[in-house]
Amino acid sequence: MSKNVAEYFACDVFNDEVMKARLPKAVYKALTKTRKLGVPLDPTYADVVANALKDWAIEHGATHYTHWFQPMTGSTAEKHDSFITPTDNGMVIMNFSGKELVKGEPDASSFPSGGLRATSSARGYTAWDPTSFCFVKEGSLYIPTAFVSYTGETLDKKTPLLRSMDVLSEQSIRILRLFGNTTATKVTSTVGP
């Protein structure tokens, strides 16, 4: 007998409902501001978010996390790391910091750059995109990220999309102000019905 989709849809997604239940009120509010307005998240709050995310992911069967991004190759890429840290007494502890959540450093030499950088300057960084929800799949916590070179050039398909959404919002707010709307703070563009 099959389950109703509504019973399990998004059950492995660290969505707004889960965040609200698991994060302290001040941290939830700060993260919501980051997600909706682009306000930088305080690094101490990033540690709290990372800890809640790790605990939730472990409860959903995750032992690893990955910074997940879409390089210019037309596919997806992942850099996996483990929550597991061995201890001196033969046990393990599960660790995940705000620094590990916010930024990763994969080798970018195998990804096309459109001639933006020399191969010797192949270091690239992933940066957490808090506007997309994290999720658990096959024992790994997937952290949606943007991917840029060490000098800031775009190496993925997501970064230009995020930048264009910001510009579109900014210009839409200008138009709304011309029409007398003084309360809107952001315009969100979507695709589809």
Task: Kindly give the residue locations of the regions a language model identified.
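Flexible glycine-/small-residue-enriched beta->alpha junction loops
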Residues: M1-A10, C134-K137, L141
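Glycine-rich, acidic/polar active-site loops that bind/position phosphate-bearing ligands
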Residues: A122-P193
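Histidine/acidic residue-rich metal-binding segments in metalloenzymes
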Residues: N4-G98, V102-S120
